[in-house]
Amino acid sequence: MKPTKWILLLMTACSTLHAQAANEKQVRRITLEEAITLARVQSVNAAVALNELKTAYWEYRTYKANLLPEVNFSATIPGYAKSYNSYQQGDGSYTFVRNNYMQMSGELSIDQNIWLTGGKLSLNTSLDFMKQLDGNKEERYMSVPIALTLSQPIFGVNSYKWDRRIEPVRYAEAKARFLSETEEVTMTTINYFFNLLLAKENVGIAQQNLENAEKLYEVAKAKRQMGQISENDVLQLKLNVLNARATLTDNESSLKSSMFQLRSFLALSEEEELEPILPEMLPSVLVDYQDALNKALTNNSFAHNIRRRQLEADYEVARAKGNLRQMTLFAQVGFTGTDQEVRGAYDPLKDNQIVEVGVSIPLIDWGKRKGQVKVAKSNREVIQSRLRQESMNFNQDLFILVEQFNNQRAQLEIANEADQIAQQRYKTNVETFMIGRISTLDLNDAQMSKDQARQKHISELFYYWYYYYQLRSLTLWDFEKNSNIDADIEAIVKK
């Protein structure tokens, strides 16, 4: 054979092997623990929970920064005006004068919010420059070397004081919610994992049932020729073959759908074919309701949520009461100077003092502000009633969950034993049918019981794991390690 033909054959073979390799998906065996680990790192749900935590973290940092001194600088460099403005003359009449000037100014201030009183204290220094561009082209400087300014509401609500009560609770709620949402990611993973596990098991069951149905149908045709069974039994077994093929097709479609869901949730490549491994090791845990309730009320975001909403309702009442009358004190003390030169603007200096007390008291508002107080109080009563109901529902749901989890191990053991018995019964019935002792109806019943028992076993295993992590989510307690579920929030946020 010529070398050219050898090369063509070799290239064809390589292309065929490459195409086969491309069509074959990489099989990845995955345990429940591995799926949970991947979901907590790669899933969209985990990313959403993390970004919500980051938002809460920076909101809390902003609140804390609002209580610290703030240094500000403002400037106009430069400002220019060429316009007409109204001017009142000595006899009281008005005329228009032309302005044509340039100005520059700068101010440096240190501002401090006073959380105890709700006021604001500022230390300022500033320098202004103005130059007339018409006439004598005079230049003037005005300095304020130092000025201390206080702005203090007298009767209004102290929002800083309320923030000191509400914001730490809000942040604690956000941290607890992040931990709970992480456990909820695990619960979603368990759901998708067992959906895939059950779908794969159903495909295996359907394949075995089809294989058995085809064998029994072949045996039945031979027996029919010998007159040992009726035509009706043969037709029934043929129908079983058709039903088994249809069931296998449906189950294979469900398997592909379940695999796609888990693969997408874990952010894995579509080239990977997942093979879930049935989890055999179970946490040996018995949960006490009162202990679980105490942990939930201490750790869960629900308790912080209740407290925050109570405080916010109280704040709204206080704010409505503060709006009944308003008084503000403004005071400024310092020194100022002005001159044609910068040095002269600082020496000599003169006192610069301002004191103002502003009062706003509604004389006739037809009960509007008092009505706002009544509305705030009524809203607080509504919120308190809802919180009591939510607390009762929370306690009830936790009680039911604890009972379900504690009973689930027994349910799982029963389902496991029933699965083994149903498998053995079906095997025995097949052998009995082969010798003509039972009918096709009995055989179909045994097969159905076998399939249902296997599915029930996997379903009960799913509920055990789901209830366990749901308890972890509500209590934020690791029952195996007997410790709180916690995380280094600072490190997580700053990644």
Write out the residue ranges for each language-model feature.
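Interdomain signal-transducing alpha-helical coiled-coil linkers
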Residues: Y160, R164, W366-R369, V373
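Amphipathic alpha-helical coiled-coil segments
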Residues: V48-Y63, E181, V185-A206, K215-Y217, ...
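A small-residue-enriched
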Residues: R40-F155, L268, L293-G371, Q396, ...
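DHp/HisKA histidine-phosphotransfer helix
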Residues: N45, D163, D233, F302, ...
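Acidic, low-complexity, intrinsically disordered peripheral segments
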Residues: Q20-K25, N72, G79-A81, E270, ...
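Regulatory alphaC helix of protein kinase catalytic domains
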Residues: N23-I36
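Bacterial Sec-dependent N-terminal signal peptides
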Residues: M1-Q26
